[in-house]
Amino acid sequence: MGSKLKLYPLLNHSSVFHPDSRYQSAPTMEEEQQQLRVLFAKYEMGRLLGKGTFGKVYYGKEITTGESVAIKIINKDQVKREGMMEQIKREISIMRLVRHPNIVELKEVMATKTKIFFIMEYVKGGELFSKIVKGKLKEDSARKYFQQLISAVDFCHSRGVSHRDLKPENLLVDENGDLKVSDFGLSALPEQILQDGLLHTQCGTPAYVAPEVLRKKGYDGAKGDIWSCGIILYVLLAGFLPFQDENLMKMYRKIFKSEFEYPPWFSPESKRLISKLLVVDPNKRISIPAIMRTPWFRKNINSPIEFKIDELEIQNVEDETPTTTATTATTTTTPVSPKFFNAFEFISSMSSGFDLSSLFESKRKLRSMFTSRWSASEIMGKLEGIGKEMNMKVKRTKDFKVKLFGKTEGRKGQIAVTAEVFEVAPEVAVVELCKSAGDTLEYNRLYEEHVRPALEEIVWSWHGDNHNNNIVKSNGNYVSDENSGSDC
C-alpha cells in the first residue's frame, strides 16, 4: 500500500504562518509606543497584527493587569447590511459564556455606532500544524491533541454551537503544549494580510469540509465538525491530507466517495476510528459520545476537564473613537441557541467562499478562476451577456465553454478571452478565465477594468488569480513581463 500512496504537501506557506496573529510574537516596546492607543480606557491597543475584509486585528494589553490580548475589530455596517445583527448578538451571547481550557477565550465584546470589538485570548505557542509540516506526529502525541480537540468541540456542541470551519489555521498550541481551538463563536476573517504584506485567503479548503457541506444542502453543522475532526486526526498521524489532488474535480469526487488510503504505519485501532469519522452519510457518521468510548481514544486520557461558565456582559459604547474618555453602558443579553443559522454560517455567508488557489497552480500565467453558487447555465448566460455588453463577438465552442473576441485588431492581433464552466457539485461551480489570443497588456486592461467588475454579481470567491503576479499597474499603465500570445 505504501508504494501507491501519493504524498502531497500538508500545507502551503500561507497556511503554516497563519494571518490571524493572535499567537505571533508580541511586538517590541518600540513598536508598541509607535502605535499605542487606548481603547475604552481599558485596553492599550498596539500594532496592527492582521487585516481582512471585515476588519482588523490588533495586539493589545489590559491596562489594569498587563495581560496580552488580541483585539479584533469588525465593521458593523457590513453586519447590518446582511440583516444579521441580532443573530450574531445571540451567538456571541452563547460564546461569551464558554470557558474551556481548549478553546481560545472570547473575553469581552464591545461596540460603538460603527464597530464591534472582540477581545480575544492571545495565544503564544503557534500553530499545531507548524509542528508537523515536516512530518507526522507520534501516535501518543496525536492522540493527546485529538482528545483535546474532541473535548472542545463536544463542549460547544452541547451548547448548540458548531464550528463549521475546523482546519489547521484554527488549531493553536499554548506555551504549555495544550491545544487551543480558535474562532468558536467567531468565524475566521476570510481574507487577511500576513507580515509579508501579501493577501492570503483563509476560508476552509474543501480538503477539510464534509461532503454534505460542499453540496450546499441543508446539513447538521455538528456532524460536519466531526468529519473535519477525522481529517485533522488523519493529518496528525500521516503528515499529509487524505483527500488531495492537483485536479479540483478529482478531489471533489474523492471527498464525495470518501476515497482515500491509509499509510502503512497507521495502527489498526486508529484506522478503525478514522473509517468511522470519514463516512459520507452524516447520519451514519460516528457521534462524539461514541468517539469517546473507542479504545484508541480512551488510551492515556486525562481526568475529565473542569470548566466554568461566567455571567455575560456586553458593552455598548456610544463613542465612535476609542479614547480614554469613552463612556460605557452595560446591557445583558439572554443567550439563545439558533437552531439552523448561527454566527459561523453568518460570517460564512458574507465570506468569499473556499480558498482553492493552491489547487490551481499552472504554468499558464494569464488565467483566473472563481467559484460560484449560480448554476452552470446561468453562468454561461451571464458570460455571454457580458461579452455583448462589451461589444465583443461571442462564440460558444462547447455547452459550457465560450470565447469572447475583440472586434478590433490590437497590438498583437485580435484579443480573445476563453471562459469554461465546471459544475463540481450541486450549487457549486468553478469558472476558469484565460487569454487565448492577443496582447498581454491589452488583455490585462480588459480583464481588470471590464471583465472582472462585470462578474462580481456571480462570484463566490476568486482563486488562483495568477495573472496579477506578473502584471503591475504603474502610473496608470499596465506593465508585464509576458511576451506570449496565448496562455490557454
From Swiss-Prot:
Which Gene3D superfamilies does UniProt cross-reference here? Kinase associated domain 1, KA1, Phosphorylase Kinase, domain 1, Transferase(Phosphotransferase) domain 1
Instruction: Name the top EC class.
Output: transferase
EC number(s) on file: 2.7.11.1
The catalytic site is made up of 165
Parts forming coiled coils: none
One GO MF term on file is: protein serine kinase activity
Q: What keywords tag this UniProt record?
A: ATP-binding, Kinase, Manganese, Nucleotide-binding, Phosphoprotein, Serine/threonine-protein kinase, Transferase
Fetch the InterPro entries from UniProt.
Kinase-like_dom_sf, NAF/FISL_domain, NAF_dom, Prot_kinase_dom, Protein_kinase_ATP_BS, Ser/Thr_kinase_AS
Q: Where is this region: Activation loop?
A: 183-212
Question: Which SMART domains does the record associate with it?
Answer: S_TKc
The UniProt similarity line reads: Belongs to the protein kinase superfamily. CAMK Ser/Thr protein kinase family. SNF1 subfamily.
The written remark on domains in the entry is: The activation loop within the kinase domain is the target of phosphorylation/activation by upstream protein kinases. The PPI motif mediates the interaction with the ABI (abscisic acid-insensitive) phosphatases.
Tell me, in a sentence or two, what this protein's role is.
CIPK serine-threonine protein kinases interact with CBL proteins. Binding of a CBL protein to the regulatory NAF domain of CIPK protein lead to the activation of the kinase in a calcium-dependent manner.
Its name, as the record gives it, is: CBL-interacting serine/threonine-protein kinase 25
What is the species of this protein? Arabidopsis thaliana
Q: What is the lineage of its organism?
A: Eukaryota, Viridiplantae, Streptophyta, Embryophyta, Tracheophyta
